[in-house]
Amino acid sequence: MQITETLAEGLKREYTITVPASDLEARVNTKLEEARPEVEMKGFRKGKVPMALLKKQFGPKVMGEAMQESVDEAMQGHLDESGDRPALQPEVKMTNEDWKEGDDIVVSMAYEKLPEIPDVDYKAIKLEKLVVTPGDDEVKEALDNLAENAESFATKKGKAADGDQVVFDFVGTVDGEAFEGGSAEDFPLKLGSGQFIPGFEEQLVGVKAKDEKDVEVSFPEDYQAEHLAGKAAVFACTIKEVKKPVPAEVDDELAKKFGAEDLEALKGQISERLGTEYKGAARAVMKRSLLDQLDDVVSFELPPSLVEAEAKQIAHQLWHEENPEVEGHDHPEIETTEEHTSLAARRVKLGLLLAELGQKNDVTVSDAEMTQAIMTQARQYPGQERAFFEFIQQNQQAQQQVRAPLFEDKVVDFIGEMAEVSEKEVSKDDLKAAVDALDEE
């Protein structure tokens, strides 16, 4: 068996693999000899079938297996010896397409190898950890929001104002024809909530019980029901009742509605929850800073195939975010831009770097951590938790999608422990501004 290098350009590698016909024949004979004891053929005792008949009966099938095994062994032997790690599955093609039994096998193998990742001086990385301590104002704001969400409504005499609730019947028509989903009875609508299409709720401000009013609106051009998008509609409304909001009192009774023993216990729960939220947000800000610094200080060649594949995935994802009504791949070819490629290069670079750092430092994701993450995701599908859990267990790709962010976060935490980290007390608004800035970059 002979392997000859034909291209070594950057990370690109190409080789010619030659498997001599004699090696192939020997492998075929060995496989047939191993199988002969179990072969039964009319006219011969079990295990006594002549080799010539075995070759005639099973030769083509065994030859195919022998060819595949020979090439696979040659490839693996080369990778083990060279230490190359292909970025993607190597492309293997048989070059002598007119091959016949008795000829050598000649195949070409091409791949891009993963680059050598340089070491990182963790101590040279300087990070700032934003610290926000939940204060009385933040707890009060959260309590007020809970009270607003727990508000009730009481019958009101007179005209409806913004923030009031109107209970009404309505029938919607387009071009004089009622449409499916365009009518309801005793529907409660809080004016100003934005629950209905733009322009609807504003026209109910000022109505009284027993009033009848035609509300004229136009459906948005991007309305989810395509047959209504952009159409003018008239809703005939009959007002049943007008109600004013009655805010819930911030007291022990409110606390009990939200599962706390009393108001002080609820305040403690809110403070703890806010603290957890602030820490999570601060961690996201610090993680971005860490990744930015790694991107700046570490440099190595990237496999073009990985960057291209990532750019296509980014372009595809962004296109679907802009066109949510289109499902699957039933759409025109999506072109990648320089912006897509630039973002892809950063993702590939940081992905390879974090993977290498994690491997070198024995960072792993435990079974318990995987189970916890899967259970957390499963709760997003009430009533289908078991089915979701079983799907993940049986799907290697889905498991990897769960494991990858866990692994990345653990590597980031490892680097964070080695880096120089300073704490900075900031306000909630400062933290929010820092988080908002992440989306703008």
Swiss-Prot record:
Keywords: Cell cycle, Cell division, Chaperone, Cytoplasm, Isomerase, Rotamase. It is an enzyme of class 5 (isomerase). One of its GO terms (cellular component) is cytoplasm. It is found in: Cytoplasm. Residues 163-248 form the PPIase FKBP-type domain. It catalyses: [protein]-peptidylproline (omega=180) = [protein]-peptidylproline (omega=0). One of its GO terms (molecular function) is peptidyl-prolyl cis-trans isomerase activity. InterPro entries: PPIase_dom_sf (IPR046357), PPIase_FKBP_dom (IPR001179), Trig_fac (IPR005215), Trigger_fac_C (IPR008880), Trigger_fac_C_sf (IPR037041), Trigger_fac_ribosome-bd_bac (IPR008881), Trigger_fac_ribosome-bd_sf (IPR036611), Trigger_fact/SurA_dom_sf (IPR027304). It comes from the Bacteria. Belongs to the FKBP-type PPIase family. Tig subfamily. Involved in protein export. Acts as a chaperone by maintaining the newly synthesized protein in an open conformation. Functions as a peptidyl-prolyl cis-trans isomerase. NCBIfam families: tig (TIGR00115). HAMAP family: Trigger_factor_Tig (MF_00303). This is Trigger factor. It comes from Jannaschia sp. (strain CCS1). The gene is tig.
